[in-house]
Regions:
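N-terminal Sec-pathway targeting helices
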Residues: 1-26
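Secondary-structure boundary elements
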Residues: 2, 87-93, 181-185
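Activation targets extended, charge/polar-rich intrinsically disordered C-terminal tails
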Residues: 9, 13, 27-30, 159-223
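N-terminal accessory segments that precede or flank the first globular/catalytic domain
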Residues: 17-89
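Glycine-rich catalytic cores of cysteine/serine-nucleophile enzymes that process amide/ester linkages
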Residues: 60-131, 156-169
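Active-site nucleophile-His-acid catalytic modules used for acyl/amide transfer and hydrolysis
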Residues: 69, 125-190
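Residues that form generic nucleotide/phosphate-binding pockets
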Residues: 118, 146-150, 204-207
């Protein structure tokens, strides 16, 4: 009994020290990310901004440990962690509708950010914009209106990442639902027998259906 007690007295402080080191490491890393985001001047050029239209899908690699984890474990063709839909706001200015967990933002779920804010919160040279091949002015408007409809409903973020649950959305699910309900095309279904994971960005970058309008990433596109 005394031997077990001694071992416990030795092991518990070691475990506590390890946990403290890990916590400190992640805290310091997160603070560095916040500093980098605050000081970032990253934006699209004026020429790139003029290329955008409602209904475009915009991707980024955000700042933070969670964003890095998504990039690392998702193993996409591009190092991206988040996406949203480009719209015009009530002032006629470019903005992005997207959904974010309240662990990462002050608002949980659906939100609208000015384009420059969305870009500023992106790691440098991580932004990609894709456009659906069939995106004409009518479809563009309908996609934007449907995205705004979900924004008005204040749909919460889906922390369970369950694409069968239509009461909550994660970022790729939101984009998929908007396009699926407006264009009546299931973007996750590439062919009659091929379907991509609902958490994947690949469906919104596949050359059979999308053109990449802006690409600040250095990785090779999907073949």
């Amino acid at each position: 009994m005394e031997s077990k007690y001694r071992k416990r007295r030795i092991i518990l402080p070691i475990i506590g020290l390890i946990l403290m080191i890990i916590t400190t490491f992640f805290f310091v890393k997160q603070q560095r990310y916040r500093k980098a985001e605050r000081e970032s001047t990253y934006q699209l050029t004026e020429g790139e901004t003029q290329l955008l239209q409602e209904g475009d899908i915009i991707f980024r690699h955000g700042y933070g440990i969670i964003s890095d984890a998504i990039v690392k474990y998702a193993k996409e063709d591009y190092p991206i962690s988040h996406c949203g839909i480009v719209v015009l706001d009530s002032l006629g200015e470019l903005a992005v509708i997207h959904t974010v967990s309240n662990t990462l933002a002050n608002i949980d779920g659906m939100q609208l950010d000015k384009l420059n804010k969305f870009i500023k919160e992106s790691q440098v040279n991580s932004v990609i914009v894709s456009r659906y091949h069939s995106l004409d002015s009518t479809l563009s408007t309908r996609i934007a209106e449907h995205a705004k409809y979900y924004l008005s409903r204040q749909i919460p973020f889906d922390n369970n990442f369950d694409c069968e649950d239509s009461t909550k959305f994660f970022c790729t699910e939101f984009v998929w639902r908007v396009f699926n309900e407006v264009s009546e095309v299931d973007l996750y279904k590439l062919t009659s027998s091929q379907r991509v994971d609902c958490m994947s960005f690949a469906a919104f970058l596949h050359p059979a259906r999308f053109s990449i309008i802006i690409n600040h990433c250095e990785s090779q596109p999907i073949e």
